[in-house]
Amino acid sequence: MLENPLIQQVLFEIMDEDVVGFDVLSVLINTNEVTDDEISRQLDVKLNNIRRILYKLYEARLVDYNREKDEETNWYTYTWKPSLEKVPALVAKKMKNVLKDLKEQLELEETNMFFFCSDCEIKFTFEDAMDSGFRCPQCGGMMYEYDNKKDISILKEQINYLEDEFNKNPLFSAY
């Protein structure tokens, strides 16, 4: 399941783009139940970093934990285990949101005329450009008409790719 690029992207975002998170998940999947301290030693990563990743995964409900108190030291030991059955639903929800945003952007691109400040590299709608007298509000430079055909093409490609991935992957068929 973790080999799927869409799943990897969503997990990457959940873990704040920390690639060590994939190593943490691999340890959890391979051992099924492990303490944060054992993960830290096994990966040779600081315990605080491991805990931060585990908390992010827990917030997304992708891991669970058990807490046990050592009667001699009064310290708590947290044993973590994967709970990846929610991954397909999480990815499906994220994909639907991304598709919705891409389709809204595509509609905006297809129904508007744009102008561009080449100095600031900022794109403006016709209305915004007209309101500022076709002068960039950032630098005062002239705005020029922007041909957004390439942007439209890229958006369509992204939408088609995501829809194809979503439709062909059996993990997401229930969503």
From Swiss-Prot:
In Gene Ontology terms, what is a biological process of this protein? transcription initiation at RNA polymerase II promoter
Instruction: Cite the entry's keywords alphabetically.
Output: DNA-binding, Transcription, Transcription regulation
Which SUPFAM superfamilies does UniProt cross-reference here? Winged helix' DNA-binding domain
Supply the InterPro entries for this chain: TF_E_archaea, TFE, TFIIE/TFIIEa_HTH, TFIIE_asu, TFIIEa/SarR/Rpc3_HTH_dom, WH-like_DNA-bd_sf, WH_DNA-bd_sf
Q: Which domain of life is it from?
A: Archaea
PROSITE patterns in the cross-refs:
HTH_TFE_IIE
* Ranges for domain HTH TFE/IIEalpha-type: 3-88
One GO MF annotation is: DNA binding
Matching Gene3D superfamilies: Winged helix-like DNA-binding domain superfamily/Winged helix DNA-binding domain
A Pfam family hit: TFIIE_alpha
Q: What does this protein do?
A: Transcription factor that plays a role in the activation of archaeal genes transcribed by RNA polymerase. Facilitates transcription initiation by enhancing TATA-box recognition by TATA-box-binding protein (Tbp), and transcription factor B (Tfb) and RNA polymerase recruitment. Not absolutely required for transcription in vitro, but particularly important in cases where Tbp or Tfb function is not optimal. It dynamically alters the nucleic acid-binding properties of RNA polymerases by stabilizing the initiation complex and destabilizing elongation complexes.
Q: Quaternary form?
A: Monomer. Interaction with RNA polymerase subunits RpoF and RpoE is necessary for Tfe stimulatory transcription activity. Able to interact with Tbp and RNA polymerase in the absence of DNA promoter. Interacts both with the preinitiation and elongation complexes.
Query: What family does the database annotate?
Result: Belongs to the TFE family.
Show the domain comment: The winged helix domain is involved in binding to DNA in the preinitiation complex.
Protein name per its UniProtKB record:
Transcription factor E
Species annotation? Methanococcus maripaludis (strain C7 / ATCC BAA-1331)
